[in-house]
Amino acid sequence: VYKRQNDAVAVDIGALKISDEYTFKHSVDVATMSMIVARKYGLDDKQVYEIGIAGLLHDIGKSKVPNEILNKAARLTDEEFAIMKQHSVYGYRILQSKEDLSMEIKLGVLQHHEKMNGKGYPMGITGDKIDLFARLISVSDIYDALVTERPYKKPFSPRDAVEMIMSMTEELDITVMRCFLESVILYPVGTDVALSNGETARIVENVPNAVLRPKVLGLTTGKVYDLANDVKCANVIIL
């Protein structure tokens, strides 16, 4: 079954790479992050494998969107955005007849722009009505889109992207968000940073429930700061 799934993915993702290099790279990034988050969520090996496939294929429907819209070097008009929003439906239709792909994969593709509060698309469904695969892919999709430079926008820093995601408590699955945040390492151990108190410090430990607030060692004072609890040094800038 895995070989047949791989063959189906290779054909579809190959077509996407030809039509749009950015979306191809984005899909690989989303697949990778989604698999990491799925593992943290507790999914088994088969489900993690399938979430990877769903991540690779989540934007396959963009191959049906006109290039002048897909690669427009400016923000889309309302009419153009309405066409762009159909890509998840196009993707589902492309995969619908592929019997070797599970329904979870297909629903992940169809629903990855749905929001927990019902303000997503294409169906505007809410909460647990959104397939788990779609809820998992959604967080990684948003993060990668935020940190990637596009002709019409500058990239967010990883820190700002994480803060944006943390603010989306009404749109995203909170449990999935928590798993994502516990999987993201913004400040690798050993990285030198500048603290808001003016001191230079080195990352010594990341805190799973406070990804923006690692523990650091002050290089001049030799003091360890727990930034989750020390508001005087809360801001961190990588040097």
Language-model features: where?
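Histidine- and acidic-residue-rich, metal-dependent catalytic cores
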Residues: 3-239
